[in-house]
Amino acid sequence: MRHLDYTEQENWRQPDDTAYQSPIDIATQSVQPQETGKFAISFQDEVQYDDREIGEQFLVHGQLRLDDQIWELERFHFHDGAEHLVNGQRHDVETHFVFQHGDQTLVVASFGDVSANEKTGAVKNIYDNQVNAATLLRLLPDNHSYFHYVGSLTTPPLRHDIQWLVLTEPVAISAEDKAVLHDHYPDNYREIQEINERVITYYNDKN
């Protein structure tokens, strides 16, 4: 499968695309506090591989309970090099979990950084089809604090009105995990987009 060429991403935008694009650089000193927004995610064990032009996708059933609303998990995928920045800093990896609620889309973004102490990699297990719900939970931090904003998908079509939950704490990944992602689809991250006066909120899971 021929994947999107990220060296040509300046050609992805269409005239009618929203001005509120993703990803963005999140300046923590500018975020506003968010009082509610506690969530829980559950996964089922079976994962199906699906290679698409936008990159390799992993189809899996699961749910996100956000306050009193249920979102259904459609798929997840990886980015070799995080798409979102935090205070100008890029994490090693970003995982996107794509959820649906009717015609609405929400993406949970989870960062990963290589750790010398992490020897067995969840990412490699997923590509080796050695995966269950416990493996997928390793892609999420225990602390569910996050930044929230409204943006777009980061691959064409750049659909608008996407709810983004960008988790603040990275998970540890192995060097082998990072190498697997780089071998499959190197540097597949979109350039940072203008914030354009959007409001970014912060939910503290520890409160």
Describe each model-derived feature in a short phrase.
Residues 1-207:
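Alpha-carbonic anhydrase
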